[in-house]
Amino acid sequence: MRIIFTCGGTGGHINPAIAVAKLCQERMSDCQILFMGAEDGMENKLVPREGFRLETLKISNYQRKLTPAGIWHNVTTLFHMAGSMQKAKRVIREFQPDVIVGTGGYASFPALKMGAKLGVPTAVHESNAVPGLTTRMVAKDVDRIMVSFEDSRSQYADPEKVLVTGTPVRGEFLYTDKAAARAELGLGEKPLIVSAWGSLEIGRAHV
């Protein structure tokens, strides 16, 4: 089994793909996995750290604010898109995947779009209740849309494509022993308050 996972931008897109990739390796000893992401995304740190090969594309997100800087950014994004599509095509033909799985983020668009065009089975997972821009753009092309919530099914033009799976998480979250974790952190019986943050806004978090 040969699988391409395509994702990028934020950990919320990357970590679910890593979780599924690890599970595939555990259950299929002959499984070969390749990741595709953006040149400057968090995936460049997170994916190799988990031991997976990563192919990168020169691609960026679209700016919603149509300021002069935003317009220029979008023009540059469109310029790079053609090259990203061609590289995605080359990588897909060389790797010969059995399936391409995207977990959202702008970096997943070229591989999903090109994979569908080349006749490779494709699927996209959307963790958010309301689909993001990339998911909306590839929804008509992919073979399967996986979502975290039953209510999200109505967000798509073809509900028959939609499968409710929940959001993938790493296996260690499911089997961690509470007492052992507290001991490892040296907490003893002290009360513990956890403040959980995510995505790119974590840099602004403060108490």
Locations of regions flagged by a protein language model:
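Conserved donor-binding/catalytic core segment of Leloir-type glycosyltransferases
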Residues: I4, L187-I202
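Conserved nucleotide-sugar phosphate-binding/catalytic loop shared by glycosyltransferases and other
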Residues: I3-T10, D30-G83, T165-T167, W197
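Short amphipathic alpha-helix
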Residues: H13-Q25
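Glycine-rich phosphate-binding loop signature in dinucleotide/nucleotide-binding domains
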Residues: M28-S29, R90-D98, L185-G188
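Active-site-proximal region of nucleotide-activated glycan assembly enzymes
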Residues: M42, R53, A116-A179
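A short helix/loop element that forms part of the nucleotide-sugar donor recognition site in Leloir-type
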Residues: W72-H73, L174-L187
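Glycosyltransferases and closely related glycan-assembly transferases
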Residues: K87-I100, A107-A123, R136-D141
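Conserved small/polar residues in nucleotide/adenosyl-binding loops
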Residues: A205-V207
